[in-house]
Amino acid sequence: MFGKGGLGNLMKQAQQMQEKMQKMQEEIAQLEVTGESGAGLIKVTINGAHNCRRVEIDPSLLEDDKEMLEDLVAAAFNDAARRIEETQKEKMASVSSGMQLPPGFKMPF
């Protein structure tokens, strides 16, 4: 089933990948990404754990209606969440790039 040293090599690769993934997850937790809405009038910054770190609202919006402001804040948060997800996928893809994974194999993240 496995060629000479194949199973040992596979186990070694799995261990290396596990170490890389742990390091990458630690790096991702430290990431901060800013999402925007309303052409940059609302900015929301979240970290890799999707915790909101900062909300910035342009003073000109404070005179507008409350519902629009709430919608813009939600849109900015969603933009930040999308950006952090993309960043996480890119970083995790780099971890698995050296492994010989079977076609269609999906990582557990």
Swiss-Prot record:
Main localization of the protein described in the UniProt heading: cytoplasm
A Pfam short name: YbaB_DNA_bd
Keyword list, A-Z: Cytoplasm, DNA-binding
HAMAP family assigned to the protein according to its UniProt record, in alphabetical order: DNA_YbaB_EbfC
Quaternary structure note: Homodimer.
General function of this protein: Binds to DNA and alters its conformation. May be involved in regulation of gene expression, nucleoid organization and DNA protection.
Protein name: Nucleoid-associated protein YbaB
